[in-house]
From Swiss-Prot:
Its main location: cytoplasm. It is found in: Cytoplasm. One of its GO terms (cellular component) is cytosol. CDD domains: YlxS_C (cd01734). This is Ribosome maturation factor RimP.
Amino acid sequence: MIDLNALCSECGVKFYADELISENSRQIYRVYITKKNGVNLDDCEALSRLLSPILDVEPPTSGAFTLEVSSPGLERKLTTPSNFENSLGELVKITLKNGEKISGEILSFKDEILKLKTAENNEISVNFNEIKKAKTYIEW
């Protein structure tokens, strides 16, 4: 199994997430990376050059695929504890498993507990296991 965290570190970036999708009957393996002060094209190219020969030997799927390396974007899904830890100070919209929707600024994430400050300046805590989906957002 490929250690994407270690390979990303070699390129000076952090591994965020990966996915294998099918678009127009093509398999695409996407690797998302982050970096303080933002990811640039050179970062994506460096990781792509490092990953390509490794994926030729250990492909993420059977058959042909295209490798894409990019930033997850300003508005992105938060699916893992490390996604939340790396998004401190950002705004997030969350849907809980019980259907309740909440939003606010991420204050902290520790021991699987997310602390948010809502628009009403209330501080709330949410257990990671209660989150159905979460996504950062930008106020323009």
